[in-house]
């Protein structure tokens, strides 16, 4: 357990605690705030797991979005466990039913691909890592527990909670928590921030409170959210908030639906804030170019 892999002190501490918990439990969830390097910790853990095991051991890493799959593949490659993914438009890797690339003994899947193609998967992994593990309550993830009950599992998340207030003890045996956000900020690992919210008795909050339907994961249903919240009055208020609190700064807006995202981008652009919408239907190459453009230019 002496490997450091360039980890920060708190990442090294979390890795040590994880391997200690694996001595007692088969399935462990790890919580770390957004921005503290969960993916780097994940890669370091996988590398140490493989180095400590026998020849032929295999690891599956499962994520819920294509972008996360590519991000994890890139990080895993930097840790010497495979090559970086080809993101070109010609690459069949981004196709709906294309086989994820073999990266040595580590393979990274989207849960959608894995659920569609599980019958063609040969053998079994020795470790399954679930990125954004708060999604693990979905039946597609639960199937992994049913099919591979004896396989060691690791869940990584910033938010180990469900909107239906139920825990994860049916999937994970124990939870390892990191420092608080305040402590990360105090030690200089996270930036400080200002938090602005709508009032508890506002019209907007009443609209949110009026949402009644829930999905299988306890979250709001997209169709109802779009019907209730995708309105010009709400979008105008979002725009006014940007002007008031974030004028001239870059930002990301998380919309409730694809249609909502496109309406927001159109409204912002019409009123002088250059904006684009990116969603699950955006082609991979175009998505990559838009993200790079956002990083490198003044696009807000």
Name each model-derived stretch:
Residues 1-31:
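Conserved pre-motif I regulatory segment
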Residues 24-45, 252-256, 278:
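Walker A/P-loop
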Residues 55, 66-93:
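Conserved helix-turn-beta segment of the N-terminal RecA-like "Helicase ATP-binding" lobe
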Residues 58-69, 224-271:
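Conserved strand-helix element at the start of the C-terminal RecA-like helicase core
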Residues 70, 85-100, 116, 252, ...:
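Conserved helicase ATPase core of P-loop NTP-dependent helicases/translocases
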Residues 93-127, 138-143:
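Conserved helix/coil segment N-terminal to the catalytic DExD/H
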Residues 134-196:
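Post-DEXD/H (motif II) to motif III coupling segment of the RecA-like Helicase ATP-binding lobe
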Residues 175-252:
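Conserved interdomain linker/interface between the two RecA-like ATPase lobes of SF2 helicase motors
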């Amino acid at each position: 357990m002496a490997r450091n892999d360039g980890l920060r002190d708190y990442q090294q501490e979390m890795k040590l605690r994880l391997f200690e918990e694996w001595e007692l439990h088969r399935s462990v969830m790890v919580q770390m705030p957004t921005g503290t390097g969960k993916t780097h910790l994940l890669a370091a853990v996988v590398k140490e797991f493989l180095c400590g095991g026998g020849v032929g051991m295999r690891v599956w890493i499962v994520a819920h979005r294509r972008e996360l799959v590519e991000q994890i593949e890139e990080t895993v490659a930097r840790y010497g466990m495979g090559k970086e993914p080809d993101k070109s438009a010609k690459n069949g890797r981004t196709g709906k039913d294309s086989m994820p690339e073999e990266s040595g003994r580590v393979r990274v899947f989207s849960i959608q691909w894995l659920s569609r193609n599980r019958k063609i998967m040969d053998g079994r992994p020795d470790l399954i890592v679930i990125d954004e593990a708060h999604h693990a309550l979905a039946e597609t993830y639960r199937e992994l527990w049913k099919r591979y009950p004896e396989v060691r599992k690791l869940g990584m998340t910033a938010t180990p909670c469900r909107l239906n207030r139920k825990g994860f003890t049916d999937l994970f045996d124990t939870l390892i928590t990191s420092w608080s956000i305040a402590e990360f900020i105090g030690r200089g690992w996270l930036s400080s921030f200002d938090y602005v919210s709508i009032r508890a008795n506002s019209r907007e909050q009443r609209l949110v409170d009026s949402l009644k339907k829930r999905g299988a994961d306890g979250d709001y249903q997209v169709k109802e959210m779009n019907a209730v919240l995708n309105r010009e009055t709400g979008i105008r208020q979002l725009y006014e908030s940007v002007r008031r609190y974030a004028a001239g700064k870059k930002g990301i807006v998380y919309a409730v639906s694809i249609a909502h995202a496109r309406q927001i981008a159109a409204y912002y652009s019409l009123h002088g804030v250059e904006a684009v919408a990116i969603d699950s239907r955006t082609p991979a190459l175009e998505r990559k170019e838009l993200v790079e453009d956002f990083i490198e230019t003044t696009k807000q």
